[in-house]
Amino acid sequence: MENTENSVDSKSIKNLEPKIIHGSESMDSGISLDNSYKMDYPEMGLCIIINNKNFHKSTGMTSRSGTDVDAANLRETFRNLKYEVRNKNDLTREEIVELMRDVSKEDHSKRSSFVCVLLSHGEEGIIFGTNGPVDLKKITNFFRGDRCRELTGKPKLFIIQACRGTELDCGIETD
């Protein structure tokens, strides 16, 4: 065998000490050493799209125009990515929590990932059901590794399209 800079033979590695790489305690067990996820399960995953457009009068919130177009585009995009897509419209805060609890208890063993898209009004750290606010932590906590074991080590994406308060966001300029 030619001895080049990029080649290794068994003699050169016999006396090497094994190198142990410790992950952080918060790291899901399915992440490989190169920080990538295993995405070869039989199904790509489940995508839940919650589209809140119309709000109860008691909230004082206006209807969200354009949100149906966003929801349709997201549905098409995730279907093209081979996700099972479920659209839910105008859910109360209680219905959002119940839906997330139920979805977290589903059989995800054959799925590579999970996506939740929330289209609604919001503020910093919260999203609005049609009748009031829900803490985002309450929603995402259902999918923690200790509560939703079948998604441990798999990507869980939460996409939130909502205002985060009343302060002006100057945005960023791109090329």
Which stretches of residues belong to each language-model region?
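Eukaryotic endomembrane system proteins
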Residues: 154, 162-163
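Boundary/activation segment at the start of structured domains
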Residues: 1-115
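Eukaryotic basic, amphipathic alpha-helical target segments in cytosolic regions
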Residues: 81-85, 104-111, 124, 147-151, ...
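Short glycine-/polar-rich loops that comprise or flank the Walker A/P-loop
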Residues: 45, 153-155
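Short coil/turn segments at secondary-structure boundaries
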Residues: 59-65, 90, 100-101, 128-132, ...
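A short, glycine/acidic-enriched catalytic loop
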Residues: 119-152, 169-174
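Structural motif
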Residues: 48, 115-119, 157-159
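Conserved beta-strand elements of beta-rich interaction domains across eukaryotes
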Residues: 52-55, 90-93, 120-124, 132-134, ...
